[in-house]
Every structure is written in C-alpha cells, then in structure tokens.
UniProtKB/Swiss-Prot annotation:
One of its GO terms (biological process) is folic acid-containing compound metabolic process. Binds 2 Zn(2+) ions per subunit. Required for NAALADase activity. Disulfide bonds: none annotated. It comes from the Eukaryota. It is found in: Cell membrane. Substrate binds at residues 210, 257, 424, 517-519, 534-536, 552-553, 699-700. This is Glutamate carboxypeptidase 2. It is a single-pass type II membrane protein. The active site is at residues 424, 628, 666, 689. Residues 274-587 are annotated as: NAALADase. Changing residue 454 to A: Reduces enzyme activity.
Length: 750
C-alpha cells in the first residue's frame, strides 16, 4: 500500500528540508566529480582504443583464419542430419556452445523458444498418385530420395515434403502453371482464359520463393500444388548428376517451407517471442500458413505427370523446360488418359517444438553497449553440405580466430555477438524470436548485423548484398584481400570481383545487390533497421542460367559435394571468412563507424528515378489524379546535401573527444533506423523499412521504395482507379517524409 503524506506530516517535512538540501548539494557535487572522473576515464579509454586496434591486429585476425579448419568443421557438421527441433540439432547446439567457450568467448548461452514446426507423418507418407476412373492408383511418386553413396545407413533423413502444408487428399485435373509467378497466372487467366479454380496445379521450382508460388495458386483458386525441379533450372549442361557431378539426379527433391510470414516469425506468436509464457494463437488464426496441400517431387516423377498433359499448348518457349514432354498447360490429361485424375496424399503435422539458438559474447573494451552481430543458421533439411553448414563452419572459424586474439590480451572496441540460429529453414524462426525478445536492446545498441548462411553457391566470384552504408566498407576491405580466383594471382579480391561481376550502374565498381529476404538478416534489417550485409561466393549468373545450385535442399547436399566439386582447397570458404570476419572486425573496432551516408544519397536518387519511370507508364492517370513525385525528389536532394555536410564534419571533428565521437557514431548508427516506419508496409506490418523490402511477388528479391512499387503494381487492373492512385500518392508522401526525416538525423546537433 502507498504511504500518503498527511497534513500532520507537513511540518516534519518542512523541518527536514534544509538537511535534504544540504544532502542534495553534496550529491550534486559528488555527481560533478564522478562525471569528471568518467569523462577523464572515457578519454583515456578512447585513446587506449587506438592502441588495442592497430592495423596489425586486423592482419593477425585474418592470418589466424585457416582453410583446413573450415574444412574440418564442415566435415564435422555434415555427417548426420540436423533438422530443426530434433535431438541431433540440439546436440549440435551444445557442441557449438562448448567449443565457443573453449575458443575464448566471454559467455555462450543457449536461448530456447517454443515455435510451430512441421514434419511428415512417419506412418502415413506423403505422395502424389494418378488414379483411373475407378479411383485405383495406377502411378505413385517416390516416397524418398535414393541415398547418396556412403550414407545408406544414416537414419532420420526426413523425406521430401513442403513444410507447413495442411493435410488433405484432393483429386482433380492438373494444370501446368510454369513457375507459378504472378505473371504466369496472369497469362493463364487473362490471355489464355484458363481457370485454375478447383484444379491441382504443377509448377516448377525457380525464379521466385516457393511460398509465393503457393500463395499465387491459392489466389487462383487451386486446391493443391505440386512442385518439381525441372532440368532446365536444376541441371547445368555438360555436368553429370550426383555423385559423379554436381547436378540434380532425377530422384532428387528440393524441400522447403511454403509460408507467407512477411517477417512475422513464429506463426502462433507474431511480433512477440515464443517463450514459456507467450500467448499463442490457435492454428486457425496462425499467420502465414497455406490453406491448400503442397508437395515436392523429382523430375523423373514430374515427367510421368507432364507427359500425359492435354489442353492448350504452352504460350511461348519460356514455358518449356528440358523434359521430353510437350509442356501442355491442360487442364487435365489428353486422349486415352482424359478420364484419369491426379490425387494428393498429404499427412504432415504441425507441432509446437522447442528450438535452440547459441549466442556467444565477446565484450567490447570501450563501448560494450554497442553490438556488432555475426549470425548464421545451424539447422538443415538433411546434411546441409552447402546450406547452411558451409556458413556455420566459417562462423566457427571466425569465432576461433577472435578467441585466439582475445586470449592474447586483445579486445574489440565494441561488443561482438555471435549467433548460431535454429529453425531458419522453417521461416527464419530462431533469429526472429531472439530479435523479438531483445528488440528494445537491439534498437538502442545494434550497430550492424552480418549474415553468414551458405558460404558458397558457386566458385566464380564474390557476391555481396548489403545496405548502402556498407558499400565503402566492403570496397575498402576487398581491396586489401587477395583474390582466390585463377588468373588473378597477385590481384586483389576487389579487382577480380569488379572484373567478373561489374556494377550495371557504376563504372569500375563491383555489383552489390539489394537485401531481400529468405535469410536471417530479415528481422534485423527489415523490422529493426539495423544496418545489415551478407557475402558469399557465387556462380557466373550470365552463363549459368540454372536456379541457385542444383542440389539445393536435397539429400545430395553433402560434405563430398563441396569437397569434390565446389571448393576442394576450401580457398573460397577462406575468402568468405575473410570478408565476413573482416567486416565484423572493422565494424567492431573502427574508432569512427565505417559507414558512408553519401552512398545512401546516391542510391536514393537512383531509386527515385526508377520508381518515377515506372509511374510514367501511366502519364494520363498521373495527370488525371494529380500524382507528383516532387516531394520525394526534394527530400532526396535535401538528404544528399545534408549527408555531404555530415561527411565533411566527420573528417574534421576531434576524435579524441569521446562525447563528440559518440555523438557522430550514433548519428551513423541510427541512420538506418530512421528509414523505419513503425506502422510497416500495407498488409505487411513487420516489413518496416521504407527504402527496402522483399518483393511482394518474390520473397528472395529486394525491392526499392516498396510501398510505392506495390501501389503501382498492376494498377491498370484495379477496380477503383481513384482509390488506387490515391494509395500511390499516400505512399509517395510516406517515402518523402521518411527520407526527409532521415536527413534531419544527420544535421549538425544544435
């Protein structure tokens, strides 16, 4: 109960006042003394920081990274499956925790959450069948992939399935929908007048995220989706199938989740951590779950379905794959097969299951309340030779190198957090739940997040996706690293990267792509506004048109795949470790944060020009509805001028003054945060970055000014054009306001 001050107490209180005033004066004097002491200590610490982070420490860190260690770690991580929510993956978490402690981190903890996961039914397998007019099954798809050599006796290999597919046994005519993209369904419905309602559709993997394919099929009225990997997309010419090469065998199948979470995290606890006391929605109210059964198959089985297709011919060559079938669209089978139907048998279950992140801490010596995070996931669909363990092995070696320096008496200026995420494959759940639980700390203290999923998807050149704030950091770092590429001996990584993957916009510079989603940086960048980036080695996208790498998410993604075909010397893994680790080192140790806001100004102008050109495909409507981009271009101009002035001040200020140093660094750190709209994008409240978001039509791809882009998309087909163009105007306003507000955060503090 509160103790109230009564009238009879007032005299006593008055009598005590002089003594309290004296005490207050003493406290105030002591406070000034303490402030002076801390100011002096901070100056001393700041000066000492220049001594604990000389350039030779960066060299020592990079020199400590060893390819043979990464190779050893990868082998260790890939001998058994590590499916999220399983005992095997929990044991791997404990192993990593123990080893990170041995490496020398200050603390390593397990952070657990209880999230919704999905598994096949062990006694009722999933499959697709063709049935005759009597309902008898005359063809069934395979129940599992033939195991790769050497793995025949490995247990607990999850059979191919589409995670979070609802149960169901729909049957009906089949319709071939190409990649099941938005434009593919437009072609079917608007041009070919083919109705997918009540049909089962078959789509090939590639081009867009599988969850977008399923969403598009649902919107078209389909009652089931079959996914398959066409050789045109997953079989490179001139290369043999595994185990004799790195191509996908006919019985190989890509697993994956089919959610449409849009950044929500655990479907039952959107926006909040899935801890012990969490409120959980019922399954009917869960976020992002598909409503129709979905199942993946290999191209041998797909051929059995597609070879019987009747109906319309494919509209053009872009609808034809590499199977020896006509690629007819349907609906239904042809000729003597016209009475046959396709039936799905899906019995998977969704279960709330405990997952475990591993969080390691290396405390900063000067700014321990500023966090630089390196994170990558640990869970895999099967062995995870590339995804994710090629990344997990690199993180392990980076931690070991940092730990070695720490044992020699070194510490970073800022705190470094290392994360081994769980359940990434089930919708980025481990990283999202941890970020939700720590969102208040991260919003105040998060400097940067570097993602460390697969280290390779090819062996041709470097690939980087990051915020514009990191462009200069990446350029400067790669100029100091040696290229591992043949023909570039003695050259820098920057030189080989620029030669092999030149920027389409900026002459003499390498290509850097926008951040989309499909990986654990999503919550940090798209929701919290923490500057983020990722790097890996990739293929030649100009000549190798197939999707990603052929054995993605199949049982054949083994250690041997990497060691025999992709990186026998592990030199590309080492280079990726140097890039990822070097970025973390610079972000954690630079006196002034290595962010350049001028690069943001450049891309903002480019993005504004691009979205304006898209809008000008509708000049009459722009005029009719008085749509103007003047406010956005004005805001970009102001941002450019203020960013330039800020950069000038950044060169001239007294770096020995810890208060001014902290203030300037905070302006850099919080700039990314300034692009966050707390209300989020329309119908996607957890995507809050106004400049970048995953495409609404392909989660993997990034879109600039996404609010405006989505408002303009297919606007000519909107029922109410006045309302549609009103939304365009609103999104221009939101973008202009946000850019202007972000610019003001860089203004000189009064």
């Amino acid at each position: 109960m509160w103790n109230l001050l009564h009238e009879t107490d007032s005299a006593v209180a008055t009598a005590r006042r002089p003594r309290w005033l004296c005490a207050g004066a003493l406290v105030l004097a002591g406070g000034f003394f303490l402030l002076g002491f801390l100011f002096g200590w901070f100056i001393k610490s700041s000066n000492e920081a220049t001594n604990i982070t000389p350039k030779h420490n960066m060299k020592a860190f990079l020199d400590e990274l060893k390819a043979e260690n990464i190779k050893k770690f990868l082998y260790n991580f890939t001998q058994i499956p590590h499916l999220a929510g399983t005992e095997q993956n929990f044991q791997l978490a404990k192993q990593i925790q123990s080893q990170w402690k041995e490496f020398g981190l200050d603390s390593v903890e397990l952070a657990h959450y209880d999230v919704l996961l999905s598994y096949p039914n062990k006694t009722h397998p999933n499959y697709i069948s063709i049935i005759n007019e009597d309902g008898n099954e005359i063809f069934n798809t395979s129940l599992f992939e033939p195991p790769p050599p050497g793995y025949e006796n490995v247990s607990d290999i999850v059979p191919p399935f589409s995670a979070f597919s609802p149960q169901g046994m729909p049957e009906g005519d089949l319709v071939y929908v190409n990649y099941a993209r938005t434009e593919d369904f437009f072609k079917l419905e608007r041009d070919m007048k083919i109705n997918c309602s009540g049909k089962i559709v078959i789509a090939r993997y590639g081009k867009v995220f599988r969850g977008n394919k399923v969403k598009n099929a649902q919107l078209a009225g389909a009652k089931g989706v079959i996914l398959y990997s066409d050789p045109a997309d997953y079989f490179a010419p001139g290369v043999k199938s595994y185990p004799d090469g790195w191509n996908l065998p006919g019985g190989g199948v890509q697993r994956g989740n089919i959610l449409n979470l849009n950044g929500a995290g655990d479907p039952l606890t959107p926006g909040y951590p899935a801890n012990e006391y969490a409120y959980r929605r019922g399954i009917a109210e869960a976020v992002g779950l598909p409503s129709i059964p979905v199942h993946p198959i290999g191209y041998y089985d797909a051929q059995k379905l597609l070879e019987k297709m009747g109906g319309s011919a494919p509209p053009d060559s872009s609808w034809r794959g590499s199977l020896k079938v006509p690629y007819n669209v349907g609906p239904g089978f042809t000729g003597n097969f016209s009475t046959q139907k396709v039936k799905m048998h899906i019995h998977s279950t969704n279960e709330v299951t405990r997952i475990y992140n591993v969080i390691g801490t290396l405390r900063g010596a000067v700014e321990p309340d500023r966090y630089v995070i390196l994170g990558g996931h640990r869970d895999s669909w099967v062995f995870g030779g590339i995804d994710p363990q090629s990344g997990a092995a690199v993180v392990h070696e980076i931690v070991r190198s940092f730990g070695t320096l720490k044992k020699e008496g070194w510490r970073p200026r800022r705190t470094i957090l290392f994360a081994s995420w769980d359940a990434e494959e089930f919708g980025l759940l481990g990283s999202t739940e941890w970020a939700e639980e720590n969102s208040r700390l991260l919003q105040e203290r998060g400097v940067a997040y570097i993602n460390a999923d697969s280290s390779i998807e090819g062996n041709y050149t470097l690939r980087v996706d990051c915020t514009p704030l990191m462009y200069s950091l990446v350029h400067n770092l790669t100029k100091e690293l040696k290229s591992p590429d043949e023909g570039f001996e003695g050259k820098s990584l920057y030189e080989s990267w620029t030669k092999k993957s030149p920027s389409p916009e900026f002459s003499g510079m390498p290509r850097i792509s926008k951040l989309g989603s499909g990986n654990d940086f999503e919550v940090f960048f798209q929701r919290l506004g923490i500057a983020s980036g990722r790097a890996r080695y990739t293929k030649n996208w100009e000549t190798n048109k197939f999707s990603g790498y052929p054995l993605y998410h199949s049982v054949y993604e083994t250690y041997e795949l990497v060691e025999k075909f992709y990186d026998p010397m592990f030199k590309y893994h080492l280079t990726v470790a140097q890039v990822r680790g070097g970025m973390v080192f610079e972000l954690a140790n630079s006196i002034v944060l290595p962010f350049d806001c001028r690069d943001y100004a450049v891309v903002l102008r480019k993005y504004a020009d691009k979205i304006y050109s898209i809008s000008m495909k509708h000049p009459q409507e722009m005029k009719t509805y008085s749509v103007s981009f003047d406010s956005l271009f004005s805001a970009v101009k102001n941002f450019t001028e203020i960013a330039s002035k800020f950069s000038e001040r950044l060169q001239d200020f007294d770096k020995s003054n810890p208060i001014v140093l902290r203030m300037m660094n905070d302006q850099l750190m919080f700039l990314e945060r300034a692009f966050i709209d707390p209300l989020g994008l329309p119908d996607r409240p957890f995507y809050r970055h106004v400049i970048y978001a995953p495409s609404s039509h392909n989660k993997y791809a990034g879109e600039s000014f996404p609010g405006i882009y989505d408002a303009l998309f297919d606007i000519e087909s909107k029922v109410d054009p006045s309302k549609a163009w009103g939304e365009v105007k609103r999104q221009i306003y939101v973008a202009a306001f946000t850019v202007q507000a972000a610019a003001e955060t860089l203004s000189e503090v009064a």
